[in-house]
A protein has these predicted regions:
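Intrinsically disordered, low-complexity segments
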Residues: 1-2, 23, 93
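Short, surface-exposed loop and linker segments with low hydrophobicity and enrichment for Pro/Ser/Thr
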Residues: 21-22, 208
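Extended rod-forming repeat segments used as scaffolds/tethers
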Residues: 12, 16-17, 26, 352
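Residue-level hotspots at or immediately adjacent to binding/recognition sites across diverse folds
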Residues: 35-353
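N-terminal secretory signal peptides that target proteins for export/translocation
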Residues: 1-16
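Bacterial N-terminal signal peptides
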Residues: 22-32
Length: 353
C-alpha cells in the first residue's frame, strides 16, 4: 500500500488554518524489502536523496531504509540504519562524513563513507520530527523540523545545540550556499535568513502565507522556494524581496484521467539549484528543470505509470551536471545535464524528452 503525499488540513495554529504535507501518514505504508545489505529493486517510499557523483547516490525512506548506488541507480544496496522510523533527509559534507534525519528527532551519522550509521544524541524532543538538514562541513550541520525545531552542531555531531523557534511552525527545508549565508523555509510562508553563520536569524517576508516545502540558494543572493499550489518563488537580493514564477506544470496529459481539477495546483516539495541548472519536484509526477538559472522552467513528462506518483527529494552536484530525484514507490530518476532518465533503479527509459 502506498500512502498519498497530498496536503491535509491539520490543527489550527495562531488562528491560521494549517496545511501540512502528509508526512505523518507514511508510517502505515507497507514495506516489502528485506533488511540488511544486498542488491535489490527499490519499492519503498523515498523522501531524501544525496548525489555524490554522476554515478553514486544515497537515498532514505520508510522504516529506517537507507540505500546506496554506485552505478547511477542501475543497482542499489541497503545499509543498516539501526532504526525502523521513517527517514526524511540525508546530506554529506564530504565523501566520509554524512548525516540523516527522521521521525522522532532521529539523527544518524557516518564517518566511514556510509558503511556504518550510528545514532547521535538529539537535543530536539522525540515528539518532534526532523525533515531536512545541511552539512556545511565535517563539523558543522544544521537540521530543521516540526514545531519550529532547529538544531546545529559545530563539532561533527559530538554535541548539538537547540536553536528552535518559539513559534509553532513546521520548518521543512534549509539551504546554505556558503558557510555564512543560510536560509530556512516552512509553513505559513516562513523564511528565515542568516548572514553570520547562524549566530542570528531574521525573518524575511515572501509575500504569502502558503507553506514552503523546499528552498535552494545557488548564491547568497539568488534563491528559490517552492510550496503548495504549485508555488515557485525567486529572490535576487538574498531574500529581501521575492517574485512569483510560473512553472510549466505537467497537467495537460492528465486531464483524460479525470484528476485535472485536483492536479492544477499540486504541491511542490523540493528544489535544487546549482549553477545554471535546477530541478523542482512535487505531486502528481511534477518534475521541472531549468538550464538558464531559473529564468524559465520546462516540465518533464514522466511515463504514464508514474504520472500520479509524488516526488519528494532531489539532489544535484555542485556544478549541476548530474543528480537524482526520488519519490513514492521507489521512484528514482537519474539527472544528466537536465535530461531525465528513469527509473534509475534498473528499469531505465527516456522520460519523453
Amino acid at each position: 500500500m502506498v500512502c498519498s503525499h497530498r496536503l491535509l488540513e491539520d490543527r489550527h495554529a495562531g488562528g491560521r488554518r494549517r496545511q501540512v504535507a502528509a508526512l505523518a501518514s507514511i508510517v502505515v505504508a507497507v514495506l516489502t524489502l528485506p533488511a540488511g545489505a544486498g542488491t535489490l529493486a527499490v519499492k519503498d517510499n523515498l523522501y531524501g536523496v544525496k548525489a555524490m557523483s554522476a554515478s553514486e547516490a544515497w537515498a532514505v525512506g520508510n522504516f529506517g531504509s537507507i540505500y546506496h548506488t554506485a552505478d547511477a541507480g542501475k543497482t542499489w544496496e541497503t545499509r543498516d540504519s539501526g532504526t525502523k522510523v521513517p527517514l526524511f533527509g540525508i546530506d554529506f559534507a564530504d565523501a566520509e562524513h554524512g548525516w540523516i534525519v527522521g521521525k522522532s528527532s532521529t539523527i544518524l551519522a557516518t564517518a566511514d563513507g556510509g558503511k556504518t550509521w550510528k545514532p547521535e544524541k538529539s537535543v530536539i524532543p522525540p515528539e518532534k520530527h526532523l525533515f531536512n538538514l545541511k552539512a556545511i562541513d565535517a563539523r558543522t550541520v544544521w537540521v530543521v523540523g516540526d514545531w519550529g525545531a532547529i538544531a546545529t552542531t559545530h563539532d561533527g555531531g559530538a554535541t548539538w545545540e537547540d536553536r528552535s523557534l518559539a513559534d509553532d511552525v513546521v520548518l521543512y527545508a534549509v539551504s546554505f550556499p556558503d558557510p555564512q549565508h543560510g536560509f530556512i523555509a516552512g509553513e505559513f510562508g516562513t523564511l528565515l535568513a542568516t548572514a553570520d553563520g547562524g549566530r542570528t536569524w531574521e525573518k524575511r517576508p515572501v509575500g504569502t502565507e502558503k507553506t514552503l516545502f523546499g528552498v535552494s540558494f545557488a548564491t547568497p543572493e539568488k534563491g528559490w522556494a517552492v510550496g503548495i499550489d504549485g508555488l515557485i518563488l525567486r529572490t535576487r537580493d538574498a531574500g529581501q524581496t521575492w517574485e512569483v514564477q510560473h512553472g510549466a506544470l505537467a497537467i495537460e496529459s492528465l486531464e483524460e484521467l479525470g484528476f485535472l481539477e485536483t492536479l492544477k495546483n499540486p504541491g511542490l516539495y523540493d528544489v535544487r539549484m546549482a549553477g545554471q541548472q535546477g530541478v523542482v519536484v512535487g505531486d502528481t509526477g511534477n518534475l521541472m528543470t531549468t538550464a538558464d538559472g531559473g529564468e524559465t522552467w520546462t516540465a518533464r513528462e514522466l511515463p504514464e505509470k508514474q504520472r500520479l506518483v509524488w516526488l519528494r527529494g532531489v539532489s544535484l552536484l555542485p556544478d549541476g551536471s548530474a543528480g537524482f530525484a526520488v519519490g513514492a514507490g521507489g521512484f528514482m530518476a537519474a539527472i544528466d545535464h537536465g535530461q531525465i532518465v528513469l527509473p534509475a533503479n534498473g528499469r531505465r527509459a527516456a522520460a519523453g524528452l
